[in-house]
């Protein structure tokens, strides 16, 4: 029965190793990721459909991240959502079409609503 001793010793050692604490997402994380995705979509569509009238959506995303001060994991998820939004529309459009312009209008409305909801529900 000697082989059980090393296994027990290994189990005891594993139990003594500190486990890093898992970060808990804030309750608005899902909405933030959706907002990041929308901003990425707008970052792609704006130069196609409304190049002179829109703000720099990438800078808006950077400002949002700076304001929220997420940990590295959340920061990467927000950046991933932004990139996913950009990529989704980059696969669909090469020029501004009626559909692209309509998508941009809907995205602007959704971004405004999402930002307002996050602020009204979670701002201090």
Show the residue positions of the predicted features.
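Hydrophobic helical h-region of N-terminal Sec-dependent signal peptides
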Residues: 10-12, 16
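Bacterial N-terminal signal peptides that target proteins for export
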Residues: 1-10
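N-terminal signal peptide c-region/cleavage motif recognized by signal peptidases
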Residues: 18-20
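N-terminal secretory signal peptides
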Residues: 23-64, 115-124
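Compact alpha-helical subdomains of small soluble proteins
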Residues: 54-124
